[in-house]
Swiss-Prot record:
Official protein name in the record: Large ribosomal subunit protein uL24
Organism the protein comes from: Caulobacter sp. (strain K31)
Spans traversing the lipid bilayer: none
InterPro entries, per database record: KOW, Rib_uL2_dom2, Ribosomal_uL24, Ribosomal_uL24_CS, Ribosomal_uL24_KOW, Translation_prot_SH3-like_sf
Gene this protein is translated from: rplX
UniProt family annotation: Belongs to the universal ribosomal protein uL24 family.
């Protein structure tokens, strides 16, 4: 199945503690059907000191969200579903609300 959400897409969170927050997708975990969104769903992780990080301590990092809990933001700033259509000889993604082609 083609990816409806890709790295770099601007998305909004639909459910959970960060509902309504927007951010860019930094990573897509295809097998787990999850995405990492920049600045959203932050969790605290306790890390040991290492040579790379001699300080250690409590660090904040993004946790993955299920793809069903995020939606792409269209050009008007509203969440939209994604469809596919053929333009010429290419398959492209488009926003169902506006019909505009999504870059990427």
């Amino acid at each position: 199945m083609a990816a409806k959400i890709k790295k770099g897409d601007r998305v909004v969170v639909l459910a959970g503690k960060d509902k309504g927050k927007q951010g860019a997708v930094t990573q897509v975990l295809v097998k787990a059907n999850r995405v990492l969104v920049q600045g959203v769903n932050l969790v605290q992780r306790h890390t040991k000191a290492t040579q790379a990080d001699p300080q250690g301590g409590i660090k904040s990092k993004e946790a993955a969200l299920h793809v069903s809990n995020v939606a792409i933001v269209d050009s008007k700033g509203k969440p939209t579903r994604v469809g596919f259509k053929i333009e010429g000889d290419k398959k492209v993604r488009f926003a169902k609300t506006t019909g505009e082609v999504i870059n990427g």
